[in-house]
Amino acid sequence: MKCLLLALGLALMCGIQATNIPQTMQDLDLQEVAGKWHSVAMAASDISLLDSESAPLRVYIEKLRPTPEDNLEIILREGENKGCAEKKIFAEKTESPAEFKINYLDEDTVFALDTDYKNYLFLCMKNAATPGQSLVCQYLARTQMVDEEIMEKFRRALQPLPGRVQIVPDLTRMAERCRI
């Protein structure tokens, strides 16, 4: 009987933790996310979007800058012609404070999945016409150090997203030309 109660208690505890998976944020303070960031991990619904340095959506976000109109300027680096190029993406605010419209390759939406503002930001890009087929997310950190607890939180945050999202291995151990 004691084992049954213990098993029931553990099942309830696991169930409570499973329901604590972050969804798209309801609010985002642009002034708090402003500043320098490092791409620590990437994930995609189609791994070919990230599987090589020259893959179309393998970009390294460097900085986020809010504009006076509450839009967001995203400064990133990407592989281009055996080198690295800095790009700027203008992200226009939408009715949702954590979601922005963009025009970058086939992607049209950027959204914040979760952040604590000081240590990490989970940022995703998707194509609204094919949300399960073209979704890329990044675990951004204020430093280049990987926090295993936050990495696990990133994995859990990706689980409810549409499609089968695959994570690219730890980017901090790779010597890629565009990674700073």
Swiss-Prot record:
It comes from Equus caballus. Pfam families: Lipocalin. GO terms for molecular function: retinol binding. Lactoglobulin is the primary component of whey, it binds retinol and is probably involved in the transport of that molecule. Disulfide bonds join 84-178, 124-137. Keywords: Disulfide bond, Milk protein, Retinol-binding, Secreted, Signal, Transport. This is Beta-lactoglobulin-1. Belongs to the calycin superfamily. Lipocalin family. The keyword Signal applies. Residues 1-18 form the signal peptide.
